[in-house]
Amino acid sequence: MNIEKKGLLFLSYGSPSSKDDLVPYMTSIRHGRVPTDAEVANLTHRYDVIGQWSNVELQTMAERQYNRLLTLLPSIPSAIGYLHMKPSIADAVDALVKQGVEHIIAIVTAPFFTSLGTGAYEKQVQAAIGDFQDVTFDVIRAWWDQPSFIEYWVKAVSDCINDTKDVFVIFSAHSIPLINSHNADSYALALEESAKEIAQRCDLEQWSVAWQSAAPHGQWLGPTVAEAINQSLHSGAIHIAFVPFGFVSNHVEVLYDNDVECKELVDAGGAV
C-alpha cells in the first residue's frame, strides 16, 4: 500500500527587513499598484518609530515562529512561504515538491478565517500546485477555537490587568471590507465568541470588540478602535487595555497603530 508523503507549509504575511524592501512590499500588497512617494514616506515613518530597521526580532518574527513549530514536528518535510515577501508561497510549494511531498498541509499565521485574508494564501497555494501533477493540499483555515489559543490570551490579559480596577478591555483584530456580508458576519461572530470566553474567564466587567487597520477608502467592518476608545472614555474608564488577539506577533499594526496612535487618544482622554 502506498502512503502519500505529507509536508508542512507555513504561511505568513511577510515583513520588510530594510527600506529597500518597502516599494516591492507595498506594491505586492496593492496587487501591483506602485505606491506614491507620500504612501512610502508614511509607512517608512511608522517603521522608523517602532525600530523596524534595527530590530532583528521584528524582521524575523515569522521565521522564529516557523522554527518553533518545527521543534514540535521535527520529522515532517516543511517550508515557509510569504504572501508579500520572498520566499514566495510558490517558492515554498516548489521546495516541498522537491522533497517528494505529495500532500501539503498549510497553516496560516492568522487565527481567524476570512476569505480576503486566509483565502488569499489558499488561492496562491492552489495556483502553485497547479504546476505539479498529483500534488494535493489542505489548509488549516482557523485555529482560534483551540484551547491553547484561549489559554494564552487568558493568561496575557490576566497578567496585564493584574489587580487593576476599572479596566476597560478592547479586543481588536484587522478590519475587512464590507463587500461580502456573510464573510464579515462569520468573522465578527468568531471574534465575539472568542473575546467573550476570554473576558468571562478573566472576570472582565467592561470590554468590547473593535476593528483596526482599515484602509481609508470604502466601507469596513466596525466599530473602529478609535470609536471603542471614545466609548470607553465616555463611560468613565480610567484604565484601558488593548488586546490585539487577531494578530499573532508584534508588528507595525500593533506597535504603531495600538502602542502609538491609540495611546495618544487614551492620553488625550485623561485615561491610562
Predicted regions located by residue number:
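Active-site-proximal alpha-helix that buttresses catalytic centers in soluble enzyme cores
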Residues: M1-V272
